[in-house]
């Protein structure tokens, strides 16, 4: 009887600790900088891709950019989201859109992730979380910072035209494609 009371108290304590940690993590996302305003120019940046090349957002002027931030390579939600972007890659290309993924992982981690998962779009290493900060996409977990799961659609003039701050990895690529269809009248018929 005494052991079951201790076990119950221990389980309740663990559950309370988990809820507190989740709440702190959620609030930490809100504690960073604000995302760029829809209608404003997307902050420019240069980051290293999985192949070691410097990628500058400005180099994509003239194209639509799907800039998506995600927490971590090789995790279930991030892998699902990346697989769906890869599955739909040809449709993005038909819409004159490129996909750029950003996380705080290293370029080497991105290379391994792309190789293992068959990803053929750029993943950018924001190891010092400066770009994630600038886009209001940081989860500060105290001892570690991760990119938050946010996405920005940037038009060919470099203007943020849509943002997603609450992303379901399983549905997100379809939502972004639909938004591009609305933002680009006739894009599907090109």
Show where each model-derived region lies:
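Structural micro-motif
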Residues: 119-121, 138-141, 145-152
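N-terminal targeting signals for export/organelle localization
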Residues: 1-48, 186, 190
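Short active-site neighborhood of thiol/selenol oxidoreductases, capturing the structured segment around
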Residues: 58-80, 85
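Structural microenvironment flanking redox-active thiols in thiol-disulfide oxidoreductases
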Residues: 79-119, 127-134
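Short loop/turn microsegments at loop-to-beta-strand junctions
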Residues: 42-43, 64, 148-150
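A short beta-strand-turn-helix
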Residues: 36, 45-65
